[in-house]
Amino acid sequence: MLEGAKLIGAGAATIALAGAAVGIGNVFSSLINSVARNPSLAKQLFGYAILGFALTEAIALFALMMAFLILFVF
């Protein structure tokens, strides 16, 4: 019974990974749109996009860490 609950909890925690993938896609699609509108700001916008990517990926890594904790620690 407990093992099944752990698997369900870990599966629910990994749903955040799909959200992070959508978020990263939004970051880079916005970068492409912004550079297409104003190519002279491409270098500055790329820095902002990398920052957004890193923050979004950090959330995904935290969710993955929680899934592993649910599976192997509790």
UniProtKB/Swiss-Prot annotation:
The record marks E57 as: Reversibly protonated during proton transport. One of its GO terms (molecular function) is ATP binding. Keywords: ATP-binding, CF(0), Hydrogen ion transport, Ion transport, Lipid-binding, Membrane, Mitochondrion, Nucleotide-binding, Transmembrane, Transmembrane helix, Transport. Belongs to the ATPase C chain family. It is a multi-pass membrane protein. GO terms for biological process: proton motive force-driven ATP synthesis. Its main location: mitochondrion. HAMAP family: ATP_synth_c_bact (MF_01396). It is found in: Mitochondrion membrane. InterPro entries: ATP_synth_F0_csu (IPR000454), ATP_synth_F0_csu_DDCD_BS (IPR020537), ATP_synth_F0_csu_sf (IPR038662), ATPase_proteolipid_c-like_dom (IPR002379), F/V-ATP_Csub_sf (IPR035921). The chain crosses the membrane at residues 8-28, 45-72. This is ATP synthase subunit 9, mitochondrial. F-type ATPases have 2 components, CF(1) - the catalytic core - and CF(0) - the membrane proton channel. CF(1) has five subunits: alpha(3), beta(3), gamma(1), delta(1), epsilon(1). CF(0) has three main subunits: a, b and c. CDD domains: ATP-synt_Fo_c_ATP5G3. This protein is one of the chains of the nonenzymatic membrane component (F0) of mitochondrial ATPase. SUPFAM superfamilies: F1F0 ATP synthase subunit C. It holds the Pfam family ATP-synt_C. GO terms for cellular component: mitochondrial membrane; proton-transporting ATP synthase complex; proton-transporting two-sector ATPase complex, proton-transporting domain. It comes from Marchantia polymorpha (Common liverwort). Coiled coil: none annotated. It comes from the Eukaryota.
